[in-house]
């Protein structure tokens, strides 16, 4: 496996994200800089500067034209990928903790923090994609959900943008029917009817499969779970010994990659091996751990897999991004024998 070490942040990583082709990698951290990298060699393409606090989240559209970011300065910003120009800024009363483009990239959702008397909320904005008027975006959201119960910390659009899936601080996963032609606003009082208690602690990450029909979650309760996007049925559970911060689904091989480790405040009192700072590979179907890959000097905060499945990137508390390219043996190996390994066209 060929690792590439990327050093472009002064503080711990919060999220890494590949574009659709996988040739670009975007990283954000607890500093105000957004970095763009060439994934094949680790060369830095450029930076996006304008935020005034921790950048919690980032997402790029399917054409690698527009970038959206959320920060602790209570802003969500829209950027032009090619030039680094900030096209528009949305202002909120609290920090923007998670942003995500819809499947057709015509909408963006943002999850805002619950703080200072303000409830946590989820807002959906329609994006004006005309290059001539990029700087003219709607300030008002097309939909607002204010959470009456435990706040949402992560969210994503489900298949065909029919649903929005949210992960909450108490371990619940919820779905909301989304129709941008008939927007709904107000306080959500029906959380119990469209949610399931998937975890016993806060959900730290939620990532969709390639077709968005199921997704994987990671939690501080030391488990990662594979969940159906429509029914919220827990399909598989992957249990570890340490809190998990991120999980991602491999698009071509039957693996789920998870990362986490002992809390950052305790890392100086233990060795790297005891802290469980490795990236872990779990078989998606058999729920068995297949491999571990060390490298970071602290907890792993975020994981993203190349859309073609040929590499993955991880960002840690140590401030580094590691891009690991898989060897041919990874794709040729049959861990459970040829009869139990799915062919690519069957997955």
Curated annotation (Swiss-Prot):
Gene3D superfamilies on file: YVTN repeat-like/Quinoprotein amine dehydrogenase
GO biological process: cytoplasmic translational initiation; formation of cytoplasmic translation initiation complex
Keywords: Cytoplasm, Initiation factor, Protein biosynthesis, Repeat, WD repeat
Primary site of residence: cytoplasm
A GO molecular-function descriptor: RNA binding
WD repeats: 8-49, 50-89, 146-186, 198-237, 239-278, 295-336
One Pfam family hit: EIF3I
Localization per record: Cytoplasm
Domain of life of the native organism: Eukaryota
InterPro entries, A to Z: eIF3i, WD40/YVTN_repeat-like_dom_sf, WD40_repeat_CS, WD40_repeat_dom_sf, WD40_rpt
This protein's record includes keyword Repeat: yes
Coiled-coil zones: none
Annotated family: Belongs to the eIF-3 subunit I family.
PANTHER family with a match to the protein in the record: EUKARYOTIC TRANSLATION INITIATION FACTOR 3 SUBUNIT I
Quaternary state and interactors: Component of the eukaryotic translation initiation factor 3 (eIF-3) complex.
Function description: Component of the eukaryotic translation initiation factor 3 (eIF-3) complex, which is involved in protein synthesis of a specialized repertoire of mRNAs and, together with other initiation factors, stimulates binding of mRNA and methionyl-tRNAi to the 40S ribosome. The eIF-3 complex specifically targets and initiates translation of a subset of mRNAs involved in cell proliferation.
Protein name stated in the entry: Eukaryotic translation initiation factor 3 subunit I
């Amino acid at each position: 496996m060929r690792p590439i070490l990327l050093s472009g942040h002064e503080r711990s990583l919060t999220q890494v994200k590949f574009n659709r082709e996988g040739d670009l990698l975007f990283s954000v951290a607890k500093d105000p800089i957004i970095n763009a990298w060439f994934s094949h060699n680790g060369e830095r393409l450029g930076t996006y500067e304008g935020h005034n606090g921790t950048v919690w989240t980032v997402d790029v559209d399917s054409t690698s034209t527009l970038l959206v970011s959320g920060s602790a300065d209570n802003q969500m910003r829209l950027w032009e990928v090619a030039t680094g120009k900030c096209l528009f800024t949305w202002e909120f009363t609290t920090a923007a903790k998670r942003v995500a483009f819809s499947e057709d990239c015509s909408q963006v959702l943002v999850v805002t923090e619950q703080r200072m008397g303000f409830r946590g909320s989820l807002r959906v904005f329609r994006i004006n994609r005309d290059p001539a008027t990029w700087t003219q975006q709607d300030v008002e959201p097309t939909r607002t959900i204010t959470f009456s119960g435990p706040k949402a910390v992560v969210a994503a659009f489900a298949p065909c943008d029919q649903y929005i899936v949210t992960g909450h601080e108490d371990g619940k996963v919820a779905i909301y029917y989304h129709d941008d032609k008939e927007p709904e606003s107000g306080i959500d009082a029906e959380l119990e009817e469209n949610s399931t208690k998937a975890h016993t602690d806060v959900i730290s990450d939620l990532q969709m499969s390639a077709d968005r029909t199921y997704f994987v979650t990671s939690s501080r309760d030391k488990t990662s779970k594979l969940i159906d996007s429509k029914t919220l049925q827990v399909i598989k559970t992957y249990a570890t010994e340490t809190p998990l911060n991120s999980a991602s689904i491999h698009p071509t091989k039957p693996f789920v990659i998870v990362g986490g480790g002992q809390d950052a405040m305790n890392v100086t009192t233990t060795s790297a091996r005891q802290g469980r700072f490795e990236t872990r590979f779990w078989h998606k179907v058999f729920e068995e751990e297949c491999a571990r890959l060390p490298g970071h000097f602290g907890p792993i905060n975020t994981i993203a897999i190349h859309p073609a499945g040929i590499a993955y990137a991880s960002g840690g508390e140590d401030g580094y991004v590691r891009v690991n390219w898989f060897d041919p043996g990874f794709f040729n190996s049959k861990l459970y024998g040829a009869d139990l390994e799915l062919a690519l066209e069957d997955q």
